[in-house]
Amino acid sequence: MVDREQLVQKARLAEQAERYDDMAAAMKNVTELNEPLSNEERNLLSVAYKNVVGARRSSWRVISSIEQKTSADGNEKKIEMVRAYREKIEKELGAVCQDVLSLLDNYLIKNCSETQYESKVFYLKMKGDYYRYLAEVATGEKRATVVESSEKAYSEAHEISKEHMQPTHPIRLGLALNYSVFYYEIQNAPEQACHLAKTAFDDAIAELDTLNEDSYKDSTLIMQLLRDNLTLWTSDQQDDDGGEGNN
C-alpha cells in the first residue's frame, strides 16, 4: 500500500526542486488512491500540472512562430523538420491534458459531494482549462469538440460559483478570469470576454468587505489581472473600431 503522506511529501519536495514532472506523478498517485483531496493536495496537483503543461504550451508557441517564418522562406527540408517537432510537442501536450482530464472525470469531480461547491468549481474550472489548452493546438472538428467541452465545464462551474460563493472568493474570481480568456482567445468573442470580466470585477469591488483575510492577497491579485485584461481588451476593440477589424 502506498503511503499517502509520503507521496504528498514527495510532491512538496519536487516542487521545491522545481521538478514538476515528478510532482505531477506523485499527485497523480495520490488522486488514484480515490479519496478526496485536502485543499493543500488540490493545490499541489494544480500547480504540478500547470507547470508541466505550461512548459509544453510555451514550447509550442515558440515552434509555431518559427514554423510560420520558415514557411515564408520556402525551405522544404527545414519546414518539414519544424512541423515534425511541433507535432511532437502537440502529442506531449495532448497526453498531459488527457492525463489531467482522466483524473478529473474518474476521481475528482466524481467524488465531490453535492455540497462541496468549492471543490466542484475548482475541478470544473480545471476541466475547462485543460480542454482550453487542447483547443489552443487543435484544428478542424477536433478543435470544435474540445472547445465545446471547455465551454460546458466553465459554464457549469460559473453557475455553481454564482449561486454558492462570494464574488470575492479567489476560486470564483480565478474562474471568471480564465473563462473570460477562453471567450477572448478561443471563441474570438471580445464582447462576451469583457462583459464576464467586468461583471466579476464589479461584483467583487461591491463586496470588498466580505474579503477573507486568508485569501485577501489571492483575491486582489486576480482582480488586478481581470482589470489588466479589461484594459487591454477594450483598447484592442477601440483600435479595431478605428480601422479595419483584424478578427
UniProtKB/Swiss-Prot annotation:
Keywords: Cytoplasm
Gene3D superfamilies recorded: 14-3-3 domain
One term under GO cellular component: cytoplasm
Pfam families: 14-3-3
InterPro entries named among the record's database cross-references: 14-3-3, 14-3-3_CS, 14-3-3_dom_sf, 14-3-3_domain
GO biological process: protein localization; signal transduction
GO molecular function: phosphorylation-dependent protein binding; protein kinase C binding; protein sequestering activity
Main location: cytoplasm
SMART domains recorded: 14_3_3
UniProt entry tagged with the keyword Cytoplasm: yes
Localization, UniProt: Cytoplasm
Site annotation Interaction with phosphoserine on interacting protein: residues: R57, R132
Recorded superkingdom: Eukaryota
Function: Adapter protein implicated in the regulation of a large spectrum of both general and specialized signaling pathways. Binds to a large number of partners, usually by recognition of a phosphoserine or phosphothreonine motif. Binding generally results in the modulation of the activity of the binding partner.
Subunit architecture: Homodimer, and heterodimer with other family members.
Family of this protein: Belongs to the 14-3-3 family.
The name this protein goes by in its record: 14-3-3 protein gamma
Organism name: Gallus gallus
